[in-house]
């Protein structure tokens, strides 16, 4: 698992919070102080808390669990998509649709529609559709792909959710709480840690910081997968030896 260091966190600007006037008092225990009216996050707390989050992810994935990566703000989108894809995990990078988890049955129907439309589009030319009709089909598929592409291979509800910016993803937290799904989240000084099982106090605006968090969680996923694979191989060898 990637060992993130204090120096790397400083270089990525993890310690820079928001302007002091926007602070959330519930984050007081994670704030070191203020500089130029900007809150400074206490990295001596952030580092071990991030490591705890990584360990929780590794254990969960080693037990065949699924982690849903969520980050729909502009700075997070590409990074969330890249790192979740690298880890082979589902993601939401465009927009959180209300009921994405609490109304998963309906979402599954939309995913089925996406699959059907994609298949129809692949055979559209041979099926005699006009160029205009094919263009409309492409637009439909692109729209559905943007919203659901990251979760189309998700086999049911996730076992945990990794979130960048709890203020931006309030809908995600509400649904996770309703369903009892644990949340691992980056929480900046202007947001509340309520409803988050594994809090990672830190900057949620800098692309460098977001990359550091996502890479670290994706690495933990890959380590968990590797452990699960090794255990499966060991069990198969044991069974063969009997």
From Swiss-Prot:
**What CDD domains does the record point to?**
RPS2
Q: Which SUPFAM superfamilies match?
A: Ribosomal protein S2
Question: Which PROSITE patterns does the entry mention?
Answer: RIBOSOMAL_S2_1
Q: Record's InterPro entries?
A: Ribosomal_uS2, Ribosomal_uS2_bac/mit/plastid, Ribosomal_uS2_CS, Ribosomal_uS2_flav_dom_sf
Per its record, what are the GO molecular function terms?
structural constituent of ribosome
Q: Which family does it belong to?
A: Belongs to the universal ribosomal protein uS2 family.
Q: What does the miscellaneous comment read? A: Present in outer membrane vesicle formulations which are used as vaccines in human.
Question: What is the recorded name of this protein?
Answer: Small ribosomal subunit protein uS2
Q: What is the lineage of its organism?
A: Bacteria, Pseudomonadati, Pseudomonadota, Betaproteobacteria, Neisseriales
